[in-house]
Swiss-Prot record:
Top EC category: transferase
Localisation: Cell inner membrane
Sequence similarity: Belongs to the glycosyltransferase 28 family. MurG subfamily.
The protein's annotated pathway: Cell wall biogenesis; peptidoglycan biosynthesis
Residues noted as binding UDP-N-acetyl-alpha-D-glucosamine in the record, renumbered to the chain: 16-18, 128, 164, 192, 250, 295
Protein name: UDP-N-acetylglucosamine--N-acetylmuramyl-(pentapeptide) pyrophosphoryl-undecaprenol N-acetylglucosamine transferase
Length: 372
């Protein structure tokens, strides 16, 4: 039997981990299915360093956003967009992808337009609950429009966010919570850049609790903020190492989530999706300056279903947080975690990959031999 020729997927994603990591999840799965994967990104973006480490070849197009930029950059937009479109078309002609997957980032806009204009199939995925302008435009020319949250785009297919396989494979919340006793386990996640509001409020809130009321705290702060956080806890009368565990970065987020009874964190799209996939109770404090306040809407997907609590940063204080923590029990948090897990889309990676394969004309994404 003659083997079918190897097909090529081109992933367009860049700028932030929220775009890159779900793209990598799909890329790895399709490589396992026998596909060739090429990544289109910006040479100045994090993808230029991260993606090659995963064994995926890169193509580059220079294009950036306008937010926070000066008048000169805004006036140069037409020229920069034209240049990016020309570069994108050149890449498409050279790579000849069977399907292009747009996962977000500024680079997706010119490359997505050229994909559609060149007659190649475009699959678009929106990670947030509120789509940005670029994806709203590209959704009109894409073959399939996929969304992580319901109703993010008109006619979008709800697939969820592609996540790492180990997150979706975590032990069920009911079994995890039932094995525990003693103080609550609270994970505070500030992200790689740290979340100043959490780093300031949480230490003071914990200090307001009596010693027998205090949860076990693991606080991830970001490397640049770890010393300031240590000082915040010290000022609150708490000692790092003895009273709380402070870490600059967490390599194994699956275990960190699974070991927690409660996560206190921002509500970026991937954070919300990962917490739901593992099944853990969450107190979300949305980043107040996110575009279109999309973090509030992301968090609302779980909160509206009794799977999380949302507190706006302006309403977060040491006193209110301490009172809320004092009122929580492992049983109530376990119920919240169960509801969160029930809303997850654990097969999102496979679903997105299969849609890409289908759009490209494959009968099936994978076969027993790992070929198409």
């Amino acid at each position: 039997m003659t083997a079918l020729p190897q097909r090529t997927l081109m992933v367009m994603a860049g700028g932030t981990g929220g775009h890159v990591f779900p793209g990598l999840a799909v890329a790895h799965l399709m490589q396992a299915w026998g596909w060739k994967v090429v990544w289109l990104g910006n040479p100045a973006g994090m993808e230029a360093t991260l993606v090659p480490k995963h064994g995926i070849p890169m193509e580059y197009v220079r294009f950036g956003g306008l937010r926070g930029k000066g008048l000169k950059t805004k006036l140069m937009l037409p020229l920069n967009l034209l240049r990016a479109c020309t570069q994108s078309l050149s890449v498409l002609r050279r790579v000849k992808p069977d399907v292009v997957l747009g996962m977000g980032g500024y680079i997706t806009f010119p490359a997505g337009l050229m994909t559609a204009l060149s007659g190649r199939p475009l699959v678009l995925h929106e990670q947030n609950s509120i789509a940005g302008l670029a994806n709203k435009v590209l959704a009109k020319v894409a073959k399939r429009v996929l969304v992580a949250f319901p109703n993010a785009l008109p006619h979008g297919e709800w697939t969820g966010n592609p996540i790492r396989a180990e997150l979706a494979g975590a032990i069920a919340p009911k079994a995890r919570y039932a094995q525990r006793s003693g103080p609550l386990n609270v994970l505070v996640v500030g992200g790689s850049l740290g979340a100043a509001a959490l780093n300031e409020v949480v230490p003071r809130a914990v200090a307001l609790l009596a010693p027998n009321e205090r949860p076990r705290i693991v606080h991830q702060a970001g490397a640049k903020h770890i010393e300031a956080l240590r000082e915040n806890y010290a000022a609150a009368g708490l000692q790092a190492g003895a009273d709380v565990e402070l870490v600059p970065f967490i390599d194994d987020m699956t275990s960190a989530y699974a070991n927690a009874d409660l996560v206190i964190c921002r509500s970026g799209a991937m954070t919300v999706s990962e917490i739901s996939a593992v099944g853990v109770a969450a107190l979300f404090v949305p980043f107040p300056y996110a575009v279109d306040d999309h973090q509030t809407t992301n968090a609302a997907f779980l909160a509206d279903n009794g799977a999380a609590l949302v507190v706006q940063q302006r309403d977060l204080s040491a006193e209110t947080l301490a009172d809320w923590l004092r009122s929580q029990t492992r049983e109530t948090l376990a119920e919240m975690a169960e509801r969160s897990r029930s809303l997850a889309k654990p097969d999102a990676t496979e679903q997105v990959a299969q849609i890409c394969a289908t759009v490209a004309g494959s009968i099936s994404g994978a076969s027993p031999e790992g070929k198409q």
